[in-house]
Amino acid sequence: MFAFLTSKRVGILPARWGSSRFPGKPLAKILGKTLIQRSYENALTSRSLDCVVVATDDQRIFDHVVEFGGLCVMTCESCANGTERVEEAVSQHFPQAEIVVNIQGDEPCLSPSIIDGLVEMLEGNPAIDIATPVTETVDPDAILTNHKVKCVFDKTGRALYFSRSVIPNNFKRSTPIYLHIGVYAFRRAFLSEYVKIPPSSLSLAEDLEQLRVLESGRSIYVHVVQNATGPSVDYPEDISKVEQYLLCPSKVSF
């Protein structure tokens, strides 16, 4: 646990059992390893993090992470979302943390270079308190589904809006459309402020918690990436897509 006390750049994977779309998702098997193990081991390949840890409120997940040799901490069941779970873990276990990356536990194919890029953004610009990745897409299924979040941003990289709808509307099809990838790098002090911002009308309407930041008048900056990630796991049927991707990345659409 010495790493907990000294780590300044921390990656945390919030994990819970009770997903409405896929109960028990963190322990679902993907080619012999669980989803949370694959996501954890993938995050470990980032060169910018001093420590990677799972934060959970479920004893089954905790025991499993410890069993495969990972670091895990228990958090309260009352956490309303993953960000609150991350903040609690940092507050209780990482007194020296300066940058905290909230890494989704259902993204086993996330490129570690994305994590590194976000950390570099915060280290290189003290004015940025929170950064998140986006990637351009021309996939009509990804553009049209409300399960994929779209983002528009200004010339400085400051996010203007996130939506489950198609933005921009793009009648002339000349403007790129960017998908949001749900990873966030926070400056430690701002993470504590973030969880205190109450839900806003737009965040509730879109079911996107990051919109509370924009509605409060604060800024989120985006990191534009290419060939960013493979399929994530939202539903049980996504397991086969991830397995196909891991076996042959070039032949899977998602």
Curated annotation (Swiss-Prot):
InterPro entries: Cytidylyl_trans, KdsB, Nucleotide-diphossugar_trans. Its main location: cytoplasm. It holds the Pfam family CTP_transf_3. GO terms for cellular component: cytosol. It catalyses: 3-deoxy-alpha-D-manno-oct-2-ulosonate + CTP = CMP-3-deoxy-beta-D-manno-octulosonate + diphosphate. SUPFAM superfamilies: Nucleotide-diphospho-sugar transferases. Belongs to the KdsB family. This is 3-deoxy-manno-octulosonate cytidylyltransferase. The lineage of its organism: Bacteria, Pseudomonadati, Chlamydiota, Chlamydiia, Chlamydiales.
